[in-house]
Amino acid sequence: MTEPAKREDSGLPEAVTAIRPEVAAFKPYAPGLSIDEIKERYGLSQVVKMASNENPLGTSPLVQQTLRTHADLAFRYVQSGNPRLVSAIARSFGVAAESVVTGNGSDEVIDLIIRVKARPGKHNIVAFNPCFSMYELQTRFCGVEFRQVPLRADFSFDYDAFVGAADADTAVAFITTPDNPSGYCPPVEEIIDLARRLPSSCLLVVDEAYMDFADDPAAHSVLPHLTEFPNVAVLRTFSKSYGLAGLRLGFGVMHPALADYVKRVRLPFSINILAEYAGIAALQDTTFHAQTLRVTREGRTYLTGALTEAGCTVYPSAANFIMFALPENCPHDARAVFEALLRRGIIIRPLSSYNLPQCLRVSIGNRHENELFIAQFKELLRG
């Protein structure tokens, strides 16, 4: 049995310091900087945030009206299991309601799958490197071995190495498509082939948080194929194309029997009543959703062209963000450019946390934000 970690010299009571070693060594998730932080730090009145892959159009008008209409219900507990939201998701995505697991963001579903599938001291979990940090954070917090497989130099998936890292004790394998932070998006046939090659007891979790932004989602999403592959689960979120990042709402789709196990251990009422109403309204407002996709795809084309023209190495993206490396003759490194943009009121994402210190990631904004970013960025490149 693993002994609790103790910090003898901390001066704190042992009841406080005798904690699990996984917690003592835990490094929490590092979120992007907020607009208020930068305003206060640099004394700015206006700040443009292009770091957290949020919706460039904000929140749907129908969602806003729905929240106003139902605000007086905030004192009520939500109906257990969110059946109305589950039904709306099932209709919108063409899946069986009994296969849907809703969560307080897709992060909660990630955590639940790990807890349900992986046993500490026995199982392992496999993902690519770099990957979304929540896969590693929650795996290590649960005391489970976390294995990572390097991406290829062009950030495509090395499937042979990935399958080679898995064994009979691999409980879960995570992939993200489109991938974060590169935006790489493989054809669905490759994901299906991977599902066939993994050990039979391994659950392949395909995180499709950014799938809506692909030019042709049907060519890349495994969601329509789930009934053929009981060893695959798909994650989706309302944070990106549906504009509900602040309400924390996501879901997973998986085999009904697995969904039942996951729902058994989910904390009650983890989705609040207003988030449920907002999620249903977001699915209903198809006009806003379509406009979001159009603006994002147009902005992605514009930023890709402008950054390429500026001499950057731009990695092809199917998501609502772009990863790029600075021109070879740039007088600044990536960290310096990030900090200089902060002082000018523009927040993008440095990628040192992904072990990519030479790269930056910019979220697609609206037209004004995109043009402002490019103007300020080019001015920095001129020294």
Swiss-Prot record:
Enzyme Commission no: 2.6.1.9
Zinc is among the record's keywords: no
Known catalytic reactions: L-histidinol phosphate + 2-oxoglutarate = 3-(imidazol-4-yl)-2-oxopropyl phosphate + L-glutamate
GO biological process: L-histidine biosynthetic process
Record-linked SUPFAM superfamilies: PLP-dependent transferases
Positions of modified residues (N6-(pyridoxal phosphate)lysine): 240
Name of the protein: Histidinol-phosphate aminotransferase
Protein source organism: Oleidesulfovibrio alaskensis (strain ATCC BAA-1058 / DSM 17464 / G20) (Desulfovibrio alaskensis)
Gene that encodes it: hisC
